[in-house]
Amino acid sequence: MAGPPALPPPETAAAATTAAAASSSAASPHYQEWILDTIDSLRSRKARPDLERICRMVRRRHGPEPERTRAELEKLIQQRAVLRVSYKGSISYRNAARVQPPRRGATPPAPPRAPRGAPAAAAAAAPPPTPAPPPPPAPVAAAAPARAPRAAAAAATAPPSPGPAQPGPRAQRAAPLAAPPPAPAAPPAVAPPAGPRRAPPPAVAAREPPLPPPPQPPAPPQQQQPPPPQPQPPPEGGAVRAGGAARPVSLREVVRYLGGSGGAGGRLTRGRVQGLLEEEAAARGRLERTRLGALALPRGDRPGRAPPAASARPSRSKRGGEERVLEKEEEEDDDEDEDEEDDVSEGSEVPESDRPAGAQHHQLNGERGPQSAKERVKEWTPCGPHQGQDEGRGPAPGSGTRQVFSMAAMNKEGGTASVATGPDSPSPVPLPPGKPALPGADGTPFGCPPGRKEKPSDPVEWTVMDVVEYFTEAGFPEQATAFQEQEIDGKSLLLMQRTDVLTGLSIRLGPALKIYEHHIKVLQQGHFEDDDPDGFLG
């Protein structure tokens, strides 16, 4: 049949559902598997698994009629293996095993897809645990021997002989659990089983009230003993639901165990628990605060090692952490001082006769990186004839051909300083006539009258702004900014190939072709006779 299968009216569906429910109370494993797989595949394709889609897909894949699929789906809903969800007036279905666990309790019980291959009786027995209601069923309550009140009573009445056996494994578990602080969200996931987790604190507390005695190995549990007895009286439904087997610890229990208010003031989030865990670890010296306020593992500490003594350890590691932080700060301050000295010594005076033009350009534009804002302001403010004296970097007497470079010209994008010698900048000895000066990347110092020199005839010596000016004069002002953003100076321009212009500059293809052709014409006019015109400029 070409169209989608005609679904029966609700009355017929209800009758079919009740008849099927009367005949067999549990859905057959085949149908359960088919329906759950269909729901999962629809959700994975972001399609809403409503009744019509589920019936159509089950029929296409496996062949049963929509009425039968509906009946089986109703059974699965009764078994709580499938959840019916109403969203914006339309009803869809979800696989209960993939739904997030309820927020208040621990993780949900075993997923309901387990009885897939099991007989119908096992499937029928599965329903009660899944909804996770606060009042637990009687058999589950009976099967939970580790309930908090019973544990407290047992701890109060128990003789001290079984006591030492309990804290041993717990201490071994708790030490690695508290030791690696970078994963504070781990306690809920890596939780020990419910029995030994809840029972020992009162037993240990009742057995050894004084904290100091060193022979006791479990240092972390002892330090945290006073808070745990508080949560014992009010048992939560979540504590009972797990049936006494391994139950992950809820965030609320972790907060109470660390002595915080158990989420009384608003929602309990992982962030709050993480903050409590970090504070606890920092207070006990397992973490140290950096200068920026973050928490980091002390350098000497390894996560696996247990602390030697309970009382001596926190104060010692706290002191050690402060000393380490102080040492770090001193080292960083020393490094900064050295960097500043290097900046001044490198940028102060440049013997021009010893350096080629490229080296002059890179001396301040290269590896040193942008300078601090204070230094930039100092270097920008002076202009006019007193520039060298105001900067405090005037030439030494008898310095021969040394020349003072103004640091005023700053490249707008990069923020790095480039060497500039305008006609304003004083030079004790006049420049050699044949040596062209490098114009500043931006032209003139801020607030100073424009006194740029003309663009050098040799493009090797062009700066970024010379290249921008060249293309602006050629009639491509918008595209010239692309050359400025990429910081293409004369040398880079000479090395560019055709593909670099067309694809590497984020210029649209039409203008890029025009720019390239304009430049080829310039080449043909004999601007650069010696260069090979295959490249962009050579």
Curated annotation (Swiss-Prot):
Residue positions where Phosphothreonine is found in the record: T107
One annotated Gene Ontology cellular component of this protein: chromosome
Domain (SAM): residue spans on this chain: 462-530
UniProt feature, compositional bias: Basic and acidic residues: 282-291
Pro residues bias: start-end ranges: 1-11, 126-139, 178-236, 425-436
Ranges for region Disordered: 1-30, 92-247, 282-458
Subcellular location: Nucleus; Chromosome; Secreted
UniProt cross-references to Gene3D superfamilies, sorted A to Z: Transcription Factor, Ets-1
InterPro entries: SAM (IPR001660), SAM/pointed_sf (IPR013761), SAMD1-like_SHD (IPR056983), SAMD1-like_WH (IPR048589)
Biased segments, Low complexity type: 12-29, 115-125, 140-158, 168-177, 237-247
GO process annotations (BP): chromatin organization; foam cell differentiation; lipoprotein lipid oxidation; negative regulation of transcription by RNA polymerase II; negative regulation of transcription initiation-coupled chromatin remodeling; protein homooligomerization
Effect of R43A: Slightly decreases binding to unmethylated CpG islands
Modification Phosphoserine occurs at: S161, S261
Entry note about domains: Winged-helix (WH) domain directly recognizes and binds unmethylated CpG-containing DNA via simultaneous interactions with both the major and the minor groove of DNA.
Entry function: Unmethylated CpG islands (CGIs)-binding protein which localizes to H3K4me3-decorated CGIs, where it acts as a transcriptional repressor. Tethers L3MBTL3 to chromatin and interacts with the KDM1A histone demethylase complex to modulate H3K4me2 and H3K4me3 levels at CGIs. Plays a role in atherogenesis by binding with LDL on cell surface and promoting LDL oxidation which leads to the formation of foam cell.
Oligomer and partners: Homopolymerize into a closed pentameric ring. Interacts (via SAM domain) with L3MBTL3 (via SAM domain); the interaction mediates L3MBTL3 binding to chromatin. Interacts (via WH domain) with KDM1A; the interaction modulates KDM1A function.
Designated name of the protein: Sterile alpha motif domain-containing protein 1
